[in-house]
Swiss-Prot record:
SUPFAM superfamilies: EF-hand, Ferredoxin reductase-like, C-terminal NADP-linked domain, Riboflavin synthase domain-like. The gene is RBOHB. This is Respiratory burst oxidase homolog protein B. Residues 558-681 form the FAD-binding FR-type domain. Belongs to the RBOH (TC 5.B.1.3) family. The lineage of its organism: Eukaryota, Viridiplantae, Streptophyta, Embryophyta, Tracheophyta. Residues 175-186 are annotated as: EF-hand-like 2.
Length: 867
């Protein structure tokens, strides 16, 4: 023990005493399991009192309890100090041995931490007032009594009616209420206890819920029942199935004496064991966090011109690549339209057809250009080569190739509209109603006899080709819309069969016919007779040849890239993992994708799937989620040859061809690729933030594995392993956030999670799993799951939800806090943010990337995978 005594030079009235030493000796308690845990306590000693001035140390609970020291008269410094140190030690022992529930006075920080772990009630309940509950009582009550079945709806917990009924029973038992209904006054008492935010009240409520017979003790059977209930409320089927095992685990932890029950103080001991991660933040991190919060506060610029200028500056900064590409495209379209418009304004036909013919020909010229340009963004091999082998990616947004393809398609629609409408509603009617004298200059183009009706124009080659093209374009455009392509509309079954990905796929191939008709239509022109003035073929010749070569290359390459299937796993959640042999010379980058064909399902359909294996692996793997007809049929084929699940793998089917004595007949797969994708740019960043939702984690898992392989490689170089060469790998830190709805989803990448945990000794890869089916930490319905998770993690290092060494968080991440933490850890750096998942989260992540980039020195560059 060390004692430090410092006295004020001007006055002898006060002094501070520092103590550093072990607060607990002898037998270890559940709260203080390490005899070598020390704390430093600084006491402020006055003439007639002693108070705690400062507490530092390894165990935050010592600080919590030491704050209870009362002010007492000071006889001598030595005796007073000794008395209070004994009091601290005595208090610690009392807290770990008492079997009576008492009110505990805690420091502000300790109470805040405890409440974060014990805010049992649904946040919707906590935010509502009694007036709302009373109003619902008046609506739901019958003869002034509210039944147990309506209790959850009344207090705002209607989504978990079963759990609400358990809460009702606990509150009723406490008050000796045996009726299955309560009055308004009794409900008011229930409400006051539910909304009491003190640590002790909520701990007591939780204890009462578990203690079914109200004897003040919890048996293993009662623990099992509440585990099963909590698991059911959180859709954790595996925990529910193993509730016996987990109940025994809790009893083993809290009932070391094997007396057969646990009491309230046992729960308190467990729940107040270790400070949370946020409590261990360094002082510098806290200061930075506060400063960052101030920076990120929205500031309202009063001057509207300055406000608009700032928004414009931010917009240009975030979208300059898109801006210059769009500006160039619009300029070319406008230039072509203007050139053709002026050209026809100077021709003799203008006197009869007027501005209509100029508009029609201007629209036709832009259509020629766009029909040529629309093929380039879908030349996948060319785009991949430009992205991977050149530096054009610094100025060209290759990530937006599909979006640009859609924009060009819209430009085609505008051009076709201008061309067709101007002809059909304006210049053709003018020609039909022209006098003989006015028609005279038109004879070289339309013949000696003036057309007498619309049918004359339609039956000609120029007419019927145009009509057929427009019809085919409309079909392809409509079926390509996400409402039809992803089957988002509730359509009758007969019509629904005509939509979906298959309809999109086949209708898009109608453009082969469209391009043939487009060339014919552009050759048989009314107003241009010389071949060199018929420029349609000149526009589209090179793009069509390039696209045709792409398709031939795909067909040739896929023909000899038949892969051997090594292993198949069909997981819960309609996900299937396929491990294949890697074709000779097949090179790829994490984040890229391949097209897959299975002739047993369809000889013509090719579907894209991201590669989930890392470039350094000796196999190829992909994870496929069954969402449509093709993937459903593929899963059915593989399921027939898979083995049934073992006892610890609920719903998991496997077919390990490499190890099996009997070689099952598996479907034959062809692959085409790899092709470039936004996620492959991760190597450009020292730090990456990877966000995946559900099956969207696939490309990001490949990145995580690649970063891990690079860590191993660099370690070999540092250890002097021969033959190792340093690769141009910039990524030094990765944050991976995976959000999924179902517990079974964690089976998909369980091996990768464990491998990272075992090999990443320096913590360069942070893995964060979130299960949204579990109520957020602090909710009553997940309280016991959180407790069980802590015990299991401490005992075996395995998370009970994911089954991996990575701890699972509940509900959804606070993305602003995620960005804030990365900003604090990496000031003034470029962070690559890569997202793959549904469209719903894109806006929030893009906004946060822009907001933090604008207001801090850390620059976040957002990349979205086309999902």
């Amino acid at each position: 023990m060390e004692i430090e005594n410092t006295r004020d030079s001007d006055s002898m009235r006060g002094s501070r005493v520092g103590f550093s030493g072990s607060l607990v000796s002898g037998k270890k308690s559940a709260r203080f399991k390490d005899d070598e845990s020390y704390v430093e306590i600084t006491l402020d000693v006055r003439d007639d009192s002693v108070s705690v001035q400062n507490i530092k140390g390894a165990d935050h609970e010592a600080a919590l309890l030491a704050s209870r020291l009362e002010k007492r008269p000071n006889n001598t410094l030595g005796s007073q100090l000794s008395f209070h140190l004994r009091q601290v030690s005595k208090e610690l022992k009392r807290m770990t041995s008492s079997n009576k529930f008492q009110k505990i006075d805690r420091s502000k920080s300790g109470a805040a931490r405890a409440l974060r772990g014990l805010q049992f009630m649904n946040k919707n309940v906590g935010t509502e007032g009694w007036s709302e509950v009373e109003s619902r009582f008046d609506q739901l009550a019958v003869n002034g009594m509210l039944t147990k079945s309506l209790f959850g709806q009344c207090i705002g917990m209607k989504e978990s009616s079963e759990f609400a009924e358990e809460l009702f029973d606990a509150l009723a038992r406490k008050r000796c209420i045996t009726s299955p209904a309560v009055t308004k006054d009794e409900l008011r008492e229930f409400w006051e206890q539910i909304t009491d935010t003190s640590f002790d009240a909520r701990l007591q409520t939780f204890f009462d819920m578990v203690d079914k017979d109200a004897d003040g003790r919890i048996t293993q059977e009662e623990v099992k029942e509440i585990i099963s209930l909590s698991a059911s409320a959180n859709k954790l089927s595996k925990i529910q199935d193993n509730s016996d095992e987990y109940a025994a685990l809790i009893m083993e932890e809290l009932d070391p004496g094997n007396v057969g029950y646990i009491e309230l103080y046992n729960l308190e001991t467990l729940l107040l064991q270790a400070p949370s991660h946020s409590m261990n933040l360094s002082t510098n991190s806290r200061v930075l966090s506060r400063m960052l919060s101030q920076k990120l506060k929205p500031t309202k610029e009063r001057n509207p011109f300055k406000r608009c200028k700032r928004r414009l500056d931010y917009f240009i900064e975030d979208n300059w690549k898109r801006i210059w590409v769009m500006a160039l495209w619009l300029s070319i379209c406008a230039g072509l339209f203007t050139w053709k418009f002026i050209q026809y304004k100077r021709r003799a036909v203008f006197d009869v057809m007027g501005y209509c013919v100029s508009v029609a020909k201007g629209g036709a010229e832009t259509t020629k250009f766009n029909m040529a340009l629309v093929l380039l963004p879908v030349c996948r091999n060319t785009i991949t080569w430009l992205r991977s082998r050149t530096k054009l990616g610094k100025i060209i947004p290759f990530d937006d190739n599909i979006n640009f393809h859609k924009v060009i398609a819209f430009g085609i629609a505008v051009g076709v509209g201008l061309h067709a409408i101007s002809h059909l509603t304006c210049d053709f009617p003018r020609l039909l109603h022209a006098t003989d004298e006015e028609y005279e200059p038109m004879k070289p183009f339309f013949g000696d006899e003036r057309p007498n009706n619309y049918w004359w124009f339609v039956k000609g080659t120029e007419g019927w080709t145009g009509v057929v093209m427009v019809v085919l374009m409309i079909i392809a455009y409509v079926l390509a819309q996400p409402w039809f392509r992803r089957n988002r509309l509730n359509l009758p079954s007969t019509i629904k069969k005509l939509t979906g990905f298959n309809a999109f796929w086949y209708s898009h191939h109608l453009f082969v016919i469209v391009y043939v008709l487009f060339i014919i239509h552009g050759y048989f022109l009314y107003l241009s007779k010389k071949w060199y003035k018929k420029t349609t073929w000149m526009y589209i010749a090179v793009p069509m040849i390039l696209y045709a070569c792409e398709r031939l290359l795909r067909a040739f390459r896929s023909g000899y890239k038949a892969v051997k299937i090594l292993k198949v796993a069909v997981y819960p959640g309609n996900v299937m993992a396929v491990h294949m042999s890697k074709p000779q010379g097949f090179k790829y980058t994490s984040g890229q994708y391949i097209f897959v064909n299975c002739s047993d399902v369809s000889s013509f359909q090719w579907h894209p799937f991201t590669i989930s294996s890392a470039p350094g692996d000796d196999y190829l793997s992909m994870h496929i989620r069954t969402l449509g007809d093709w993937t459903s049929q593929l899963k059915t084929l593989f399921s027939k040859v898979c083995e049934p699940p073992t006892g610890d793998q609920s719903g998991l089917l496997r077919a390990d061809v490499a190890k099996a004595d009997y070689k099952p007949r598996l479907p034959k797969l062809l692959i085409d690729g790899p092709y470039g994708a936004p996620a492959q740019d991760y190597k450009k960043y020292d730090v990456v933030l990877l966000v995946g939702l559900g099956i969207g984690a696939t490309p990001l898992i490949s990145i995580v594995k690649d970063v891990l392989n690079n860590i191993k490689q660099q370690k070999n170089i540092e250890d002097g392993t021969k033959g190792s060469k340093r690769s141009p790998f910039a990524t030094k830190r990765a944050y991976f956030y995976w959000v999924t709805r179902e517990q079974g989803s964690f089976e998909w990448f369980k091996g990768v999670m464990d491998e990272v945990s075992e090999n990443d000794q320096e913590g360069l890869i942070e893995l964060h799993n979130y299960c949204t089916s579990v109520y957020e930490e602090g909710d009553a319905r997940s309280a016991l799951i959180t407790m069980l998770q802590s015990i299991q993690q401490a005992k075996s290092g395995v998370d009970i939800v994911s089954g991996t060494r990575v701890k699972t968080h509940f509900a959804r991440p606070n993305w602003r806090q995620v960005f804030k933490r990365v900003t604090i850890n990496h000031p003034d750096q470029r962070i690559g943010v890569f997202y793959c998942g549904p469209q719903g989260l894109v806006g929030e992540l893009r906004h946060l990337s822009q907001d933090f980039s604008h207001k801090t020195g850390t620059k976040f560059e957002f990349h979205k995978e086309n999902f």
